[in-house]
């Protein structure tokens, strides 16, 4: 099946998530208007989706020290930053580095660049430039999907917030242009989940467990505005008691699997 082949090729971390539906959730959760057109509900590599980035201004600003609204998460790092406002951008899920030589090469590479390890993002060739240029973003989603292998078979599981609200996942974006073609793309940043009370149960045994770097709601502006040398301080595992996991029904799974291009 297509999903299994994809997972085998890239390690099957966070390759599939559920987009935020149109309506009031975008302004309520992210302080921006909703997209003008509905997105596909299930987002896979190379599918179009939206992310939130910074529309920069010129003057420097120091973020407020009390931006962390969620209790239980460590304090937000502060420091001089570039002032800007949030901007919703349509892009491809799966980052295309600026040095890619052709659109065909971009298609092949982006499928494997849907996740960026936070520990090595500053040194990995595919993501380093985006990180150093401060091209950070927030990826809105209702849930992400991971396989539960505890029964010996892969059971896709939907992982969402306990309160049902959207999540904002830390990401990077990039703009690729060559020979009259342009691709705006993004990737999800991930953190280690070996010791996470919930996420350590998922993905295949014997491999390092990973999870998306979910941001606290009060940290969105600080994440987008922080200097790159401070940005890694936002890479933390989201509290397990704020998340819930529910298996996906088999009939629905077959429909999801066919959605991979």
Named regions from a protein language model:
Residues 42-46, 86, 132, 152, ...:
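Short, surface-exposed loop/turn motifs at beta-strand boundaries within globular domains
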Residues 70-128:
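A glycine-rich, hydrophobic loop/mini-helix early in the fold
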Residues 136, 148-168:
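Catalytic cores of histone-lysine modification enzymes
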Residues 2-95, 229-233, 258:
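Extreme N-terminus nucleophile/cap motif
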Residues 2-8, 12, 24, 67, ...:
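C-terminal accessory segment of soluble enzyme catalytic cores
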Residues 91, 98, 160-192:
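A motif-centric signal for short, conserved binding hotspots located
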């Amino acid at each position: 099946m297509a999903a299994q082949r994809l997972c085998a090729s890239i390690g099957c971390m966070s390759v599939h998530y559920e987009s935020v539906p149109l309506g009031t959730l975008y302004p309520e959760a992210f302080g921006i208007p909703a997209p003008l057109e509905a997105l596909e509900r299930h987002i896979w590599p190379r599918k179009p989706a939206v992310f939130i980035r910074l529309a920069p201004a010129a003057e420097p600003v120091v973020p407020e020290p009390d931006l962390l609204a969620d209790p239980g998460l460590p304090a937000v790092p502060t420091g001089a930053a570039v002032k800007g406002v949030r901007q919703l951008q349509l892009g491809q899920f799966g980052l295309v580095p600026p040095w890619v030589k052709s659109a065909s090469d971009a298609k092949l590479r982006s499928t494997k660049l849907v996740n960026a390890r936070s520990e090595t993002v500053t040194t990995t060739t595919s993501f380093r430039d985006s990180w150093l240029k401060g091209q950070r973003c927030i990826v809105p989603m209702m849930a992400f999907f991971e396989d539960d292998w505890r029964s010996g078979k892969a059971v896709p599981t939907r992982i969402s917030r306990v309160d049902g609200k959207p999540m904002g996942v830390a990401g990077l974006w990039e703009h690729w242009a060559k020979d009259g073609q342009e691709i705006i793309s993004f990737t999800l940043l991930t953190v280690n989940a070996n010791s996470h009370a919930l996420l350590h149960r998922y993905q295949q045994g014997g491999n390092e467990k990973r999870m998306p770097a979910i941001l606290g709601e009060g940290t969105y502006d600080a994440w987008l505005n922080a200097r790159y040398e401070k940005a890694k301080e936002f890479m933390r595992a989201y509290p397990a008691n704020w998340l819930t996991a529910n298996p996906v029904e088999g009939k629905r799974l077959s429909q999801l699997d066919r959605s991979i291009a």
